[in-house]
Swiss-Prot record:
Similarity comment: Belongs to the flavodoxin family.
Keyword entries, A-Z: Electron transport, Flavoprotein, FMN, Nitrogen fixation, Transport
Protein name: Flavodoxin
The Flavodoxin-like domain, residue ranges: 4-173
Any Pfam family: Flavodoxin_1
Gene3D superfamilies xref list: 3.40.50.360
GO molecular function per UniProt: electron transfer activity; FMN binding
Cofactor dependence: FMN
Function in brief: Low-potential electron donor to a number of redox enzymes. NifF is the electron donor to nitrogenase.
Gene Ontology annotations of biological process type: nitrogen fixation
Length: 182
C-alpha cells in the first residue's frame, strides 16, 4: 500500500487536475492515486498516516458541497462521516484553489475550514505557505502572513502553479518522509 493518501473535493475538476499533478511526481509505492472524497469511505481515509488533501473554495468562501451549489457531494458531506475519528498520529498537508480576483474577500477560505476540522481532531498539520505574491484582500486561511496550506489560483496565476507545487512539496517533504524527484 502507498504511504501517502491523496484526497480532494472538486466541483469543476480543477482540484482533481492539481491532485493528479501532485501524484504524477511520485510512484504508486509512495503516493496513492487521487481519490475524490465523494467516492471515499471512512476506511479509505483512515488507512493512511500521511494525507494530502485538496479543496476548492466555493460560493461565499465555503467548502465544496451541495449547499454551495456544487454539482455533487464533496467535503461538506464527507466531513460529518469522519467527524468521530481520531486523527492523532496523522500528518496532513492541505492545498486549496480559489480565484483571488473575483473573490478577493474569501480567497481559499475552504483551507481554513479543513485545517480547523483536522486540527480539532488531533492531526499534525504541515505545509503553511507564504501569502506574498497574491492579490487578494482577505482570507480566513491566512494566519501570521501564511496560508494554512498551499494556495493556488488557476484562474489568474496558473503559470505560477508548477513552481508553487514544487516549492510546497519541498516544504512538506521532511514531514512526509518524501524524497522529491530531481
Amino acid at each position: 500500500m502507498a504511504k501517502i493518501g491523496l484526497f480532494f473535493g472538486s466541483d469543476t475538476g480543477t482540484t482533481r487536475k492539481i491532485a493528479k499533478q501532485i501524484k504524477d511526481m511520485f510512484d504508486d509505492e509512495v503516493m496513492a492515486k487521487p481519490l475524490n472524497v465523494n467516492r471515499a469511505d471512512v476506511a479509505d481515509f483512515m488507512a493512511y498516516d500521511f494525507l494530502i488533501l485538496g479543496t476548492p473554495t466555493l460560493g461565499d468562501g465555503q467548502l465544496p458541497g451541495l449547499s454551495a451549489n456544487a454539482a455533487s457531494e464533496s467535503w461538506e458531506e464527507f466531513l460529518p462521516r469522519i467527524a468521530d475519528q481520531d486523527f492523532s498520529g496523522k500528518t496532513i498537508a492541505l492545498f486549496g484553489l480559489g480565484d483571488q480576483v473575483t473573490y478577493p474577500l474569501e480567497f481559499v477560505n475552504a483551507l481554513f475550514f479543513l485545517h480547523e476540522f483536522f486540527s480539532d481532531r488531533g492531526a499534525k498539520l504541515v505545509g503553511r505557505w507564504p501569502a506574498k505574491g497574491y492579490g487578494f484582500e482577505d482570507s480566513l486561511a491566512v494566519v501570521e502572513g501564511e496560508f494554512l496550506g498551499l494556495a493556488l489560483d488557476q484562474d489568474n496565476q496558473a503559470a505560477l502553479t508548477p513552481e508553487r507545487l514544487k516549492g510546497w512539496l519541498s516544504l512538506i517533504a521532511a514531514d512526509f518522509g518524501l524524497v522529491l524527484p530531481a
